[in-house]
Amino acid sequence: MKLTCVVIVAVLLLTACQLITAEDSRGTQKHRTLRSTARRSKSELTTRCRPSGSPCGVTSICCGRCSRGKCT
């Protein structure tokens, strides 16, 4: 019974701390790079393959073929 009360009080305390912290940080953003995906242009989002002459590898897809690390 005692342990249950301690757990309930701890959960309530942590919840209150989170709510207070969330209210204080409203309107401020420390890590602006997290939302950098919203700034991408439409051409960047629709381009799925790399043009010839670009470097290629596992993470990049060529419009043609990947030969010796370059798109052809």
UniProtKB/Swiss-Prot annotation:
This is Omega-conotoxin-like 15. Its main location: secreted. Residues 1-22 form the signal peptide. It comes from Conus striatus (Striated cone). Expressed by the venom duct. Keywords: Calcium channel impairing toxin, Disulfide bond, Ion channel impairing toxin, Knottin, Neurotoxin, Presynaptic neurotoxin, Secreted, Signal, Toxin, Voltage-gated calcium channel impairing toxin. Disulfide bonds join C49-C63, C56-C66, C62-C71. The presence of a 'disulfide through disulfide knot' structurally defines this protein as a knottin. Omega-conotoxins act at presynaptic membranes, they bind and block voltage-gated calcium channels (Cav). The keyword Secreted applies. The keyword Transport does not apply. Belongs to the conotoxin O1 superfamily. Residues 23-48 form a propeptide. It is found in: Secreted. GO terms for molecular function: calcium channel regulator activity; ion channel inhibitor activity; toxin activity.
